[in-house]
UniProtKB/Swiss-Prot annotation:
Keywords: Ribonucleoprotein, Ribosomal protein. The gene is rpmH. Pfam families: Ribosomal_L34. GO terms for biological process: translation. PROSITE patterns: RIBOSOMAL_L34. Belongs to the bacterial ribosomal protein bL34 family. Transmembrane segments: none annotated. The keyword Ribonucleoprotein applies. This is Large ribosomal subunit protein bL34. The keyword Ribosomal protein applies. One of its GO terms (molecular function) is structural constituent of ribosome. It comes from Thermobifida fusca (strain YX). GO terms for cellular component: ribonucleoprotein complex; ribosome.
């Protein structure tokens, strides 16, 4: 039996999908804008 692939880690989660990482690229900023337009309560996992 292989180990489970999801090993939760808050720091890794924020660094991979966090707000500052999203703002770094044009595509990431587009994601934030789309989520704002849609009215998402949480824009990113860290924000």
């Amino acid at each position: 039996m292989s180990k489970r692939t999801y090993q939760p880690n808050n720091r890794r989660r924020a660094r991979t999908h966090g707000f500052r990482l999203r703002m770094r690229t044009r595509a990431g900023r587009a994601i934030i804008a789309a989520r704002r337009r849609k009215g998402r309560k949480a824009l990113t996992v860290s924000h």
